């Protein structure tokens, strides 16, 4: 990309970055002459990274950090390959991939992603939890929360609850509850300038200050939900010190029970820059801790740039834990329909404990999830299916959380054959075998359900996901 074709960057932003970066500024500016890096992260719940690399028909270049991450050419259209529909990988900016592994949740822990849409970091957290423990993924935006639900479903996350609440309401219900909390805060999006016309067009100094004010309140709510001894990751995709070091500094000034944590440094990790806060009134102790934060830059590594600060909540006396959700017993008819489906169509059914109905939808609720009554939620757990008149119909979420060994009937399609696209378009195709529900797979990886009747497989791939 030539300088003449460089995206039109706001001049006030460039002047500020030149003042802050000094000798680094020419390299930073030159990064806008380069195409954006496209990242791909393997779904380790389903496939080993190297196995994915060997299977795909296009080249993947491994990144040194984080694990399971690759560089991929946009020209290959990786989002159109059937393996993407099977949830074998997520397309994500490499900088954004650093947040979840720095938070480093362990299997069995309780984890919150407070502003989770569209799901890049939430799916990463799900992989690290290995379907053990609890993941609460929250998104207040009424449309974006469905993108989040779709991506976690495709990922095969079986231990996730998806809520659509304000941070303040969640904080009232989950005090001192989570082992780890991720807040990828809404921001001015300066790290999106190379990719997004809208981000460049909407940027203004007033936007930066407005975001910083909003972030302070959201971070306070996030902190209230972290247990003593727990770890919080605060991140943004902006370079503005007011939203990065400034938000963390203001938080530390009013939260004496939190301290910054120094992460293990990887190639391309630059320190926080508290000196950019200028005359903002920040205590010396808070300023000293800000250098432990991580800044990722488009001129020093792959990706568009990110800010990450890890904050540990100090230990204190033991507190009373929240009780798990006391689920009502399923109606007899619902139990019968579900058990009939499992007996006729599955070899290994999901565990029958912690089953719950939300309307006509049947879920398996993650262990340890407190009562969500009164909160807005999309899914309170793994969506198994829907109770309809006289029967149980399996969900897309159930299909994506199973393996071929779990079901009685499988229709396996070749990723290079036209039949897989026929299925993804929602069309029927010839398929010999016993009648009934069939798990449709691509090269052995689940894509969704089909129903076979007299040698014809009717696609039950969800209408909203179908190829056009």
Language model segments and positions:
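Polybasic, low-complexity RNA-engagement segments
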Residues: 1-20, 26-53, 302-307, 312-468
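A short acidic, Gly/Pro-enriched loop at the edge of an enzyme's catalytic core
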Residues: 106-107, 169-184
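Conserved class I S-adenosyl-L-methionine
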Residues: 108-117
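Conserved SAM-binding loop of SAM-dependent methyltransferases across substrates and taxa
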Residues: 118-131
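Helix-to-beta-strand junctions that scaffold the AdoMet/dcAdoMet cofactor pocket
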Residues: 129-130, 226-228
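S-adenosyl-L-methionine
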Residues: 138-176
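Mobile active-site "lid"/loop adjacent to the S-adenosyl-L-methionine
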Residues: 143, 180-220, 233, 237-244, ...
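Class I S-adenosyl-L-methionine
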Residues: 178, 231-234, 239-363, 368
